Swiss-Prot record:
Higher taxonomy: Eukaryota, Cryptophyceae, Pyrenomonadales, Geminigeraceae, Guillardia
One of the record's GO molecular function terms: translation initiation factor activity
Signal peptide start-end: none
InterPro entries xref list: EF-G-like_DII, IF2_II, IF2_N, P-loop_NTPase, Small_GTP-bd, T_Tr_GTP-bd_dom, TF_IF2_bacterial-like, TIF_IF2
The family this protein is said to belong to: Belongs to the TRAFAC class translation factor GTPase superfamily. Classic translation factor GTPase family. IF-2 subfamily.
UniProt source species: Guillardia theta (Cryptophyte)
Cellular component terms (Gene Ontology): chloroplast; cytosol
UniProt-recorded name of the protein: Translation initiation factor IF-2, chloroplastic
One Pfam family here: IF2_N
Binding-site residues for GTP, renumbered to this chain: 248-255, 298-302, 352-355
Amino acid sequence: MKFDNHTYIQNYTSSDDETIVLINPLILNLFNKTNYDISQSNKQKDSIYHLDINIKTNSKLDKKSKKIDRNQDEVDELAKSKTKSKKKVQVEFETDDEYLNVFNKPKHFDIVEKNIRKTEILNEIKTINSATGKKNKKLLSRKKEEIVEDNQIPKELRINSSLTVQEFAELTCISDIEIIRTLFLKGQAVTVNQILDINTIIELGKDFHINIQIEEKNGLNEVNIEKNNFIKFSENTIRRAPIVTILGHVDHGKTTLLDKIRQTQIAQKEAGGITQKIAAYKVNVQYKNENRNIVFLDTPGHEAFSNMRSRGINVTDIVILLVAADDGVKPQTIEAINAIKAAKLPIIVAINKIDKDQANIEKVQQELSKYELIPESWGGQTPMIPISASQGTNIDSLLELILLMADIENYQAIEEDLASGTILESHIDRTRGPIASILVQNGTLKLGDIIVTGTSLGKIRGMLDSEGNKINTLTPSSPGIIWGLNKSLNSGDKFQTFSNEKDAKTYFSKESENNKKITYNYISENPSNQILEESSKKILNFILKTDTQGSIEAIVNAISRIKTKQLQIKILYSNLGEVTETDVEFASTTNAFVLAFNTRLAPGAKKTARQLNIDIREYNVVYDLVEDIESLIAQHSEPEYKKLKIGAATVKAVFPLGKNFVAGIIINEGKIVRSAHIQVQRKSGLVFEGDITTIKIVKKDVEEVSEGNECGLFIEEFSEWKVGDSIEIFELIQI
C-alpha cells in the first residue's frame, strides 16, 4: 500500500494464514482516520483473487504527514526501496476460504494480527532506528508498546542476580518508563541502564504484583568449587589458616569468647550488649612451638540475623557451637545445628558459663544428644569442651583442638593465585564511599587489583587488615576491609580479582550472562482477594536507612515477623548511608516514618524534619527498633475486644424525646450498665449494635439497673425502637 509515495503495507505469508503487516508505524495514527474500499475482481475459474485497498485521507492528516516526511529523508529512501506499486498492493489468495477470511477480521487497524512474533517487531525497530537515528523515538515507543500489549505480565519471576532497569522491563513486559516513575515516587532516581539490587527488584515485584523468587547463583560459586578441587591436588600450595565460625543463641557468650581469645573488650562496646554484624578476626596462636593463625567469624545470635549466620556457615571450615551451661539448647542453637548438618561441617561444642551457679553440663549434653550430637565421653563423635569465656577456663584447650582438627583436614591454598573469596558485609562511608568487609579464601589480594562479583566490577584503592592497619596485600584465609568501589557490593557474593581491566571486563561479561538465567512461573490463581484484603487495611509506611546491608536484611526480616491483623506494614525503600533531606521530603509526601539504624542525619535533614513535622526515629539496637514498631502498630490499631454477656432486656414502650425516641425496657436477667455494649434483635434479625448513651429512671441518670427493674434507654445513634424488641447486654473486655 502506498500513501504520499511511501510504502506502509507489504505482503506477509505465514503457515497459518495470510495477513497484512504494517512496516511503518506512521500508519498507526493515519489508519484509524482513513476510509478504504475493498473490491474484488474475478478473472477466471482458476484465477487468483485480488484484494485492492485504496487509501483516502483528509487534508489535515495529509499536511501532518507531509510535515513529518520533510524530516525523514532516510525513512523515505528505505520506504521507496520496498515499494512495488504506486497506488495499491495486491494480496494473493489461493482459495475462496482464504479470501473470505479477510472479511471476518476487524475493519480497522486490528487487521494487523496480534500474534506477530516479538522478534519480527524487534527487527522492524532496528530497521527504523538505523534509518532515522534520533528523529523517530515515537515510532520506536509505539513498536515497543505492541510487544508489551501482546505479552502477559508474569505472576512470578525467578532471578539469581541483580538486573538493570531495562532488563527488568523486558523480562516483565512492563514499560521502563513506568518502572522509572515508580522508583522515582519511592525517592530513587534511576536510568534505564542502572543496576537494581535484589531488594529493589523485590519491592518492584510487590508494586506490580509479581512474586519475585531468588535462586542460588551458579557462576562464581562453580568457579570456586572447581578451584577448590584443583587446590587439593595441586603441588604449588601452602597451608592456610582454618576459618572458624562461632554460632549459638543470643547472649550465650560468643563475642565474650572471642574477646578472651583476642584479649579485647568488643562485647562491652557493643550496643545493647549484642552482636549485630558479622565480624572477622585473625588470631595468632602458639601451637607445637610454632606460630599458627586462626580466622574467627563472630555472628549475631538474634533471630533477625539468620542471613548473616548463613553467610558465616558458607565460608567456614570448622564451627564452634556455643551453648550456655545455665540456659541450655535454645531456638537459635537448634537453627545452628540444622545448618551445620546441612553443610556437613566439622563441629566443636563449647559449653560456656560453667562458672555460673546454675550451670548444668550434663543437662546440656542430654539436650544436645536429642539432635544427634553425642559427646565423645559417651562414646559419640562430637568433641565437647566445658569453658568459661569470662574466666578464660579451657580456652587454650579449645584452640588446640581447632588446630588439631585443621591439621587433620589439611586446609590448603595457592598463594600466587589472583585472589578469590567472599563479601562478608558492606556499607557506605561518608569519606571513602562504598566499603566491603571481605574474606580472601585463595590467592593474594593486592592494592590496585580489579575485583569482580556477580553484579559489579571495581578497582581496590585501599585496604585494612582485621586490626584496622593499612596494608597492600591480603593472603589466603585473611579477613580485611577494602574501598574505592563505585557501588556497594552484595553481602554473601563470591568475588574474583584480576590484575588488568581487560580480563576483568571479559570475566564480568561472562558472569553477567551466567547470572541472567531466569525462569517464569505464571500463577493461575487470581490474587484479587489478597489485594482487596490488603487494600482494606491501614498502612504504616517506613523509610529505612542503615549502616550496613546486613542490618537492612536483619531489620526487614524482623519486621516481616511482626503479626498484625488491622495494619499493613510497608517499607517504601531501604538504603545504606545517612538520612538525607530527600529522605525526609519523601517521607512527608508518603506520610512515612524514617527509621535510622546505626547511622547519622545529614546536615539539614533534622531541620527539614522539624519544618515538615516528620518523625525520625534513631536506633542502635535491633530489639529497640522492633519494640518501637510494635508500639506504633498498637497506637494505630483499633483495640480488639471479646464480648461477655451480662444481661438481657425487652422493650415495653417507646417514648418521644425531641427528635429521637427513648425505649422503656425491663431487665429480664442480669443487669444493664452505662458502659455496656448492646445488640437489638427482632424477628427479622439484628437491627442495631452499639454503645449506650444514657440510662434513666424517671428523669434521673443512673449507671446500673439490675434484674426485674424498669428504666429508660436512650441511644444517640438509634431511635427506631419497636415494642417487643429484645436487647442483649454485653461487657467488652479488651484482648
